[in-house]
Amino acid sequence: MAQKKQRVYKSPIGAIPKIVNNFESKTLNQKIFYDIIGEEETQLILCHGIAGTGKTYVSIYKALQDVLRRGTGYDKLIIINPTVDVGNEDKFGYLPGELDKKIQQYNESTFTILDKIIGKAKAGKMIQEGKIEIGVLNFLRGTNLENCYVILDEAQNVSPMQIKTIMTRISHDCKMIIQGDLSQCDKYKTNGVTNYEKSGFYDVWNRLKGIEGVNHMEFNRDDCIRHPLVKRILKTYEDEHEIKL
């Protein structure tokens, strides 16, 4: 039987390099998320979703489209990850090696996505040209974020004060995407159980409901595009530890 052809959603009019010309969504919610990011009136997007839903892939894809398209007002993409090891507190200062190696250690998945979307050579060139910056929260203090996309990934491991600090850096022509999975709070646990209500991401998700210029997007277990077994595994954890936003 012939395989069903994937529907292609074309991006808005503009001169876009062929490397990121068309976005192909794998679920309806991926398409909705992509469209929300593209809304001109939306400056801050909060996205919650379990692992495997494609939230990071979609946000990076759309950001790259707008950075590479002329006349959008976005000159670069900044991708930030909190420096938290699984099951541990913030440990960036104790990592071995130089700064760039430390940053790379916490952003391996980011580099993988960049390579998948635009290729390793193009990604490396954009990093060298300053069109892509990959960093950590610790080095954002005092920085004004303008004419750029900012993606804060794994935001479930960010404190309320840290997330407030980064949001108040938003300046002109800055679009910020804060995304995370509250079921994977490595920093906030009580007796080994995730205490997601202490997370800055949980705080800001509820605090900014109904605020003009802010939009919320939530993926669910059905959006997981990994092996069907992963969905069944996730369901057992959801039944035991339900996330209530």
Please tell me what each predicted stretch does.
Residues 2-36, 40-152, 156-245:
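Conserved helicase motor core of SF1/SF2 NTP-dependent helicases
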